[in-house]
C-alpha cells in the first residue's frame, strides 16, 4: 500500500490495523482491553475492520471498578450484544468484599485495588500473553515514551529504562512463560485524530462525551457529576444543573466534566481545535505524585 496516497487518518488507520493483525498472528492468547471510552470505541472499530467479514478472534476485557458511570455500563452491554464479540468482565473480589470506594479509601488506593490489581488478576486468570490498550502518546508524558509493544515481566510491571528498540514497523513480541506484552495500536493518534475518525466513520460513543444538562458539584477545581445515590457531598457543596460534557471517562467520583455546549461531534472537533489542556486534566488520579501515571504503570496499570 502506497502510504503517500493515503490521507493522514487513513495512514493512522492502516498502521493500527497492521498492529492488530500482527498481534493476532504472533501471540497465542491476546485480549483487547475495553474501557468503554472513545479510544476503546475506535480500537474496537479498527479490530472489526481488521478481520471483516469474520469475527474478532480474541475476547474483549473490561475491568469493572463498580464505580463507572451508569451510561457507560449500559453502552458496554448494548455494544457487546450488537456486535457479538466475546466480552469478559472482571471485578476484584477482594475489593468488592471490602467495599472499596474512592470516597472511603481515596483515589490512589481505589485505583490500585480496583483497576491495577483487578487487571493483574484478570490477566493471570485467563493467561493472556498480549493485551491491547487504547492509550495514546499525546495523553500524558509517561505514555509518550512507551513503545507500541510494551514488555511486562511476570509481575506485569513496566521498566521505562529497559524498553525494547522499535525500528520502523518491526515489533519484538518475544516473551517467556508468564511474561506479556501490552500493545498500543493508537500510540500515534492524537485526541483530535480520534474525534475526526469517530465523525468520519460514524462510530457510536457514550453520550456522556456530548454536552447536556447534568447534575454536578464543584470539588477541588473539578465538576463532578452526581451519577447515583452513593455520591457523598462535602460540607458546603451544592448540586447544580450545568451544561457539561466529558473529555475522558473513568470512575465517576474521580472524573471531572467541562462546561460546554458541544452537543454534536462537529462541536467537539471545533473545541479540540482550540484546546490547550490535556484531556487527562479531568482525572483526579493523575493530580498527585503518589498517583502519578508512570508510578501506576510501573506497578501494572495500563
Swiss-Prot record:
Pfam families: PAPS_reduct (PF01507). It is an enzyme of class 2 (transferase). Pathway: Sulfur metabolism; hydrogen sulfide biosynthesis; sulfite from sulfate: step 1/3. It comes from the Bacteria. With CysN forms the ATP sulfurylase (ATPS) that catalyzes the adenylation of sulfate producing adenosine 5'-phosphosulfate (APS) and diphosphate, the first enzymatic step in sulfur assimilation pathway. APS synthesis involves the formation of a high-energy phosphoric-sulfuric acid anhydride bond driven by GTP hydrolysis by CysN coupled to ATP hydrolysis by CysD. Belongs to the PAPS reductase family. CysD subfamily. This is Sulfate adenylyltransferase subunit 2. The gene is cysD.
